[in-house]
Each structure stands twice: as C-alpha cells, then as structure tokens.
Amino acid sequence: THGECEELYFGSYEMYKRFSTYWMDGKGAHAPNVMIDKCSCPNNCGLCSNHLSHSGLANMIVTNRCDLTCWYCFFYVKKGLEGAYMYEPSLDQVRAMMKTLRAERPIPGNSMQITGGEPMLREDIVDVIKIMKEEGVDHIQMNTNGIRFALDPEAMREVRLAGVNNLYLSFDGVTARTNPKNHWEVPYALESARKTGTTVVFVPTVIKSINDHELGGIIRYAQKNLDVVHAVNFQPVSLTGRMGKKEREKYRITIPDCIQRIEEQTNGEVTIDDWFPVPSCMPLTNVIEAFSSKPKYELSIHFACGAGTYIFEDQET
C-alpha cells in the first residue's frame, strides 16, 4: 500500500456539477465471476454484484510483452526488475475467459478489446481472435502501437479476416518529439487499415507539459484521414504511484483540462459546452428498451469517467 495521498481528480467544479446531472445507475451484472460473500474490495478484484454496470467493453490482456519501452506505461516493467514476469494466457484460458464474459446477464458481453503489452507480438494472435468470434462476440478492437501493421500489411489483412473490426491505435502527437514511439509508422499503419476496410480510433495518452499542446493538431490529423479514422479517444495519463508528488503534479492532467485545451486549440470550433458524459445516452437507451421489452446495452459508467462529443465536417466552409 502507498498510504494516504492527495490528487487532483477533476479539473473543473462547474463541469463536474453539470456532468453529475446525467448520473444514472445501470442494471449491473447478475452473473458475476466474483460472488459477493467472497468480496473484500479491493483485495480480490473482479466483476461482483456490487457493480452497477455490465461490461461495456471487456479488455483482455493477451500479453504483457511489448516492443517499446514507453516511460509512462503502467504495463512497462524493466527487465530484471524483481517480481517481473511474463503474462500470456493460453488459448484454453482465453476461451474460458470468453465464456465467463458471455455468461453475464442480463447483457451477455459482446464487445471486446484485445490489449497488452503489444498483442501483435503473439504468434497465435489470429487464433485468439478466432476464439473470440467463435464464442459469439460481435465487436473486436485491438489496442496496438501499429508498428507491425506498418511493416507487414499482410498481418493487418490476417487479423481483419479473423474478426478484428477496429484498431485502437496509440498516437500521442503530430510531431516526432511528442510521439517518438510510432510517428513514422502511423501513416503506413493507416494505409494498411485503409486497404482492408478496418476503422481506426486514435488513442493519445495525454501528459501535461509533454503533449497537451497538440490535442487540436491530433484532431486535425484525424480529420485529414476521416475515411479510416473515425474517433479520437484522449486518455489522461494514469500515474500509478511510481513517482513523487512533484512529478505527478507536473504531468497530471484531467478530463476537463483536456477539454479546455481542445477548445483553445481548435479556435473555439469544439467548445467546452459541446461535451457530455458517457451516461448521457442512458435516457435514449431506456426509451428503446421500453419499446422493445428487451434488455439493451447500457453505458452507465460514472459520469466523471469519460466525456464525448461528435464533430461533423462541413464541406462548404
């Protein structure tokens, strides 16, 4: 344990209050893999009946190996570090986890993110994807740095045919300085996705004082590749206690901070008031469910966990 600490959670009180008006509890998961009488939160983590939301996008870590060593990554472990080990579930374990996901009620999990590490380091990654499809998952996206797809377009074709719908592509900035890990490879990875009909979501890890001045540039680059890039998911860096307070304050950035910078860097084209928390879609879900009389997919996460907006390109201006 790390003891007590004080951290900035949400950078705007006004936005917090506005977002809180959209807070709605979901149905929860009625077939949890951790029973309530065994729960000792947070000592035995898992989906228990205390959860008020079902799995929206399930994440499966298929390896903790990576071909990069990004300093801010909470998965990155230096070689030789005491306690470090390789995690890589077998195909049988992958199938067992998929069966657990699909057993959730009232909404069987049907959306999966393959993550790591770098998933493409697994030689049997195509088999992993096929198992997910065999177990009934509709949507599969892969969290990746894209380097393999840039160097080997055939690999993109193989995972697409196996069942991957979308690349969740790490992309931290529009310059080599802010995005040293895959700056040169991203254009080639996009071309591989374009040729195979695979959509892309840019996933910038936003770090204050490092790349928070390029959020508008990232949006504009996505716009230039609108035929293949359908979204940008800005993720404020997760500082997991490996650095001191001064360092954390130097790099810490919250969702409202990102939204404010986007307004500034898009010259007001995307304003602070354009953003809504994830559960703002819940009333529409409830209406559709009322008409269909069947449980519908809910996005009932906490209102401070994320925000979104839509941007439309006007061809006439």
Regions found by a protein language model. Name each.
Residues 183, 191-317:
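Radical SAM enzyme [4Fe-4S]-AdoMet core and its adjacent flexible, acidic
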